[in-house]
Amino acid sequence: VCMANTKPLVDNEETLRYVLEEGKKTGIHVLSCAAVSKGFKGEELTDMEGLLAAGAAGFTDDGIPLMDGPFVLKAMEEAARLDTVISFHEEDKSFIRENGINHGAVSDQLGIYGSPSLAEDSLVARDCMIALETGARIDVQHISSGYSVELVRLAKKLGADVWAEVTPHHFTLTEEAVLEHGTLAKMNPPLRTELDRQMLIAGLKDGTIDLIATDHAPHSKEEKDKPLTEAPSGIIGLETALSLGIEQLVKPGHLSLLELMEKMSLNPARLYKLDCGRICEGAPADLVIFDENETWTADQFASKASNTPFLGRSMTGKVKYTICEGKVVYQD
């Protein structure tokens, strides 16, 4: 499922149809969310009903936080009416001086302030309560703060239809990675502390965190070679996600392999109400065959970019075949 933060933005039916038509040429299923607000400005709602009819999987202004509370309330009311999902990028920029780097011990070493967990926690709290008020289905994207996990856990307990996702890099790495990998470990929200990482894993284990999503964000070498405070945030993640899930979650015993598949496949399908993500008679023959024990080196990517702190790392768990609608579209 692609996000709407493309050029041009997916905030109208024409652009959405273009993305979906181009996706059909890839050999795999490419879906797309549409924007919540026109121009990602957080001021005027897009035609959510029309975009849904045109094929939008859901709605998000991913990368740009929605700061106006009454606007968010209006958006959730419309989403509830249409029975669709809104995904939220939760970072209040008023608390952030330099994005992509956690405010903490590492930012202190670097002589910058960075991005505190409070920037995430404050918006997660707001949106969980608005979801509870409206009955809307929402997804807290790429959760990174342990306190935000606690807030989502409470919202679920209160009865809110709140879902949460975590990236492989957030459950694998901490802010210390910035000291080793520089801009290749810079992303929004940032890598946080070891305590946060452990709280993310605990959230995966008890079901507070429903999904694993990559937040795949390619950038050129030239962009990432800029100084830390000037380089863009974001890393690629599609090709390393499975291996990191196996290494960090399955091998240590945090999740079973079936539970990992639930977080990576079945639950995303449930969130977007898609008829996929499961293996049973009559289900779509969309399958990935992998060897959970085979090792490989993350040094060559199908992506045009290689901006990842896992570059050159030995990984465990290798995809052997990808099958879409019964056709082999990738073979190792």
Predicted regions and their residues:
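Short acidic, glycine/proline-enriched helix-loop-strand junctions
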Residues: 12-15, 28-29, 79-84, 161-163, ...
